[in-house]
Amino acid sequence: LFLNPHDMPTAIAEYARRTEQPVPESVGDYVRCILESLALKYWWVMEGIQGLTGVSYDCIHVVGGGTQNAFLMQLTADVTGQTVVAGPVEATAIGNILVQAMALGAVRDRRHLRQVVRKSFDVRSYQPQELSPEGKEARRRFLALDQ
């Protein structure tokens, strides 16, 4: 649906109309809609994973460029009710380098690899805040949509 539309704002507006949701009017409305949708989808996926595995997670690790968006990271923490650990930003390149280092014997194992990452790169933690009534309503509406 939103994978690669020709015109993303139009696709969002049409979906909002079709699902009887408020249609974004400004650039800020669209940005907020997208970020809230991402956070809600993270919550939905985490609920599914926890339901399938029976394992409860108290922390979500997010890597890559999206971690630079503090609003998205805090929103994710709030919506999921879980601590978000954000970073490192350049996770793909770092991972490739460290796997090569492991192959060359410079990194002993995955435990050592994770230790190198923790000591070498900045990460930021976001603690969940109580979800507002509007946030709870957004989760309810999100669940009502056809996933």
Annotate the PLM regions:
Residues 1-147:
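Glycine/Thr-rich phosphate-binding loops that ligate phosphate moieties of nucleotide
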